[in-house]
Amino acid sequence: MALIFICILHCGIWANAVNAFHIFLQITMWRLNDNKVYLPPPGPIASIVSTDEYVQRTNLFYYAGSSRLLAVGHPYFPLKNSSGKITVPKVSGYQYRVFRVKLPDPNKFGFSETTLVTSDTQRLVWGCVGVEIGRGQPLGVGISGHPYLNKYDDTENPSGYGTSPGQDNRENVAMDYKQTQLCIVGCTPPMGEYWGQGVPCNASGVTQGDCPVIELKSEVIQDGDMVDTGFGAMDFASLQASKSDVPLDLVNTKSKYPDYLGMAAEPYGNSLFFFLRREQMFLRHFFNKAGKTGDVVPSDMYIAGSNTRSKIADSIYFSTPSGSLVTSDSQLFNKPLWIQKAQGHNNGICFGNQLFVTVVDTTRSTNLTLCASTDPTVPSTYDNAKFKEYLRHVEEYDLQFIFQLCIITLNPEVMTYIHTMDPTLLEDWNFGVSPPASASLEDTYRFLSNKAIACQKNAPPKEREDPYKKYTFWDINLTEKFSAQLTQFPLGRKFVMQAGLRPKPKLKTVKRSAPSSSTSAPASKRKKTKR
């Protein structure tokens, strides 16, 4: 609302005198308010609750374990034949191992207690309460390197001032990596983050040789992805054109780091029940890289040199990492882990009858050196040309679990909540959600078998696709490896002792009862006879 004042000048003449009077009129005018109006939410927002609110746990526990899991391959790159088919895969101690554990459907189990669940309104799910990740093979440190690493000067202990690198100053350099032990457990795949090439705002203003723009990206961690080895989590394939800035096992790959912040902020907590992490690293050597420096050091940050130092040296420094000592005193594996309270809202419930276990262990990264002779006879003198050298890396795992049988009562509120979280769960449980009534007018023909009209057959329902079929995991099938005899397995015995469960003795000592005097006949004595 605004006020407008109008001034009117009124003149009057009296006796040759001129008088002027000011008359003010006030008029009210409405105009549109410039402030924004914020509407309240249309209704109450459904809050995310813990699985303990709608999952009822039973006193039935089961053990499940995998067989001995082995992986053998080349530690730096996959080997291919002439047709491009991989003959020897890449198996490195600095890769993620993402196990996709498939569990049986508890609703198809035959339990001795027939009144355990009401099939009309209840469904069964598995709850993970214990896990043990076993690791075989001895402790060791594996090294990596590059025969053409872009290493120019030793900037830690320089022998001179290098200002004029040649056309090719690459050298053969090897190193060990950052030490990492990691374990992530959830019912959906883990997420990883890395720095990749982004899209510039003004693509026309970018010239060849400009520094690429980077952005933080998040992807699913797959089995075989490289971990952070000390050179950063980044896409080396798109951000390092020389292919000489990192060791061979990182060239043309992505190094991912677990997105702990993103998984912790996930509303339902399915991807991260819990995680264990141990990282350590120090820097061993310091170098700089040859090449034209893209970001020139500002002239106001130094005083120009003279003679051989008139040209400033390259300032692109880098270091070689090292994970230092590996010891059995700081191992995260080969010990039981009990889940009492998960980090997120999902307290260990295995929705979809599956579990994802992500493992990183660089403390057993020893590379095996193999040698084969090209001559069937033993040479009398040593000749390098008569021997072929090979590299292989081996890994050994063993997974053991303790699962608890749980019940979900599907009332309307719980069904709505689960449908919002994952609609496929209700489909697997043979529960459907009726679609809203359509307000449009639909066509219905009288004669369906009529050549005069288009075919009226309904399209066959599409088979539900695996949502993770485009990702690579190490599939572990435990559908036929469940057992209720906990004391027959190592992790089961540990759980029985931890939980205070005392199994019933199977072998009972039965004492022989003495005969009663009322029923037994007196023993007759033998008469003595004279001879």
UniProtKB/Swiss-Prot annotation:
An example Gene Ontology molecular-function term: structural molecule activity
UniProt keyword Disulfide bond present: yes
Entry GO terms, CC: host cell nucleus; T=7 icosahedral viral capsid
Biased composition (Low complexity): 512-523
Biological process terms in GO annotation: endocytosis involved in viral entry into host cell; virion attachment to host cell
InterPro entries per the UniProt record, alphabetical: Capsid_L1_Papillomavir, Capsid_L1_sf_Papillomavir, dsDNA_vir_gr_I_capsid
Pfam families linked to this entry: Late_protein_L1
Keywords recorded for this protein, A-Z: Capsid protein, Disulfide bond, Host nucleus, Host-virus interaction, Late protein, T=7 icosahedral capsid protein, Viral attachment to host cell, Viral penetration into host cytoplasm, Virion, Virus endocytosis by host, Virus entry into host cell
Subcellular localization, as worded in the UniProt entry: Virion; Host nucleus
Region (Disordered): 500-531
Protein family membership: Belongs to the papillomaviridae L1 protein family.
Function per UniProt: Forms an icosahedral capsid with a T=7 symmetry and a 50 nm diameter. The capsid is composed of 72 pentamers linked to each other by disulfide bonds and associated with L2 proteins. Binds to heparan sulfate proteoglycans on cell surface of basal layer keratinocytes to provide initial virion attachment. This binding mediates a conformational change in the virus capsid that facilitates efficient infection. The virion enters the host cell via endocytosis. During virus trafficking, L1 protein dissociates from the viral DNA and the genomic DNA is released to the host nucleus.
Subunit structure: Self-assembles into homopentamers. The capsid has an icosahedral symmetry and consists of 72 capsomers, with each capsomer being a pentamer of L1. Interacts with the minor capsid protein L2; this interaction is necessary for viral genome encapsidation. Interacts with protein E2; this interaction enhances E2-dependent replication and transcription activation.
Protein name as catalogued: Major capsid protein L1
Gene for this chain: L1
